[in-house]
Amino acid sequence: MAALLILVIVAALLALGYAAFNFIGVKKLDEGTDRMSEIAEAIRVGANAFITYEYKIIGIVVVIIAIIFAAIFSVQYGKFSWEPSVCFIIGVVMSASAGWVGMKIATYANVRVSNTARKTKNIGSTLKVALKGGSVMGLCVGGFALLGLFLVYIIFGYGLNMISISALRDGQHIFTQCLSCYALGCSIVAMFNRVGGGIYTKAADMGADLVGKTEAHIPEDDPRNPATIADNVGDNVGDVAGLALLH
C-alpha cells in the first residue's frame, strides 16, 4: 500500500512539475507587436479581475455548504463530524488551483500562438506552442486531482484507522462521504467557472453585436469595442478553465 501511495504522489508531482515547465516555456515566448501585447494585456487583466471576484463568491458559498455538511453529518452520526466538510474544501482548493492556472496559461498562450503563426507561417511550430499551452491545463487537472485524493486518503484513511479491509468496512460510510464531498468540491468550482463564464461571455457577445455593430458600426470582434475584450475574458474563464475542470 505504501508503494502505491508513493506512486500516486510522485505521479501528481511529476504532472504539476511538467505543467510548470511548460508554463514557463510558453511565457518566455515573444508576444509579438505592441498592439498584440496591448490587447493580450487587456484580456489578461480582465480575466484576472473576473476570476478573482468569482472566487470570492465561491468562497462564501463554500463556507456555507461546509457548515451545512458538518451539521447534517453530525446529526446523522450522532457526533460532531467535520471530516466531509474538510474534504469538500480540499476539493474546492484543488479545483480552484487548476482553474486559476488554466486561465493564466490561456491568456499567455493565445497571443503567443498567434505571433508564432505570424512569424513562422508554419503550422507545426504553431501547433507546438498551442499544445504546450494546452497541456498545462490538462496536467494540472490530473495533478491536482491526484494530489487531493492523496491528501484525503492520508488524512482520513490513515487517521480514521481504515487501512485494513475489515476496518474500512466498519467505517465505510464516513469515508465514502469524504470521497463524495471531495468530488463535489471539485465539481462546484467547475460549475461556477463554466456557467458564470458562459453567461458573462454571452452577455458581452450580445452587447458587442447590438451596440458595436448596430449602433457604432464597428466590425465584429474588433478590439476597439470593449465588449469584444469582455467576450474574450469570458472565453478564457468559461471555455478554458470551466470546460477543462468539468472533465
Describe the predicted segments one by one.
Residues 2-247:
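Hydrophobic, small-residue-rich transmembrane alpha-helices and their short perimembrane loops
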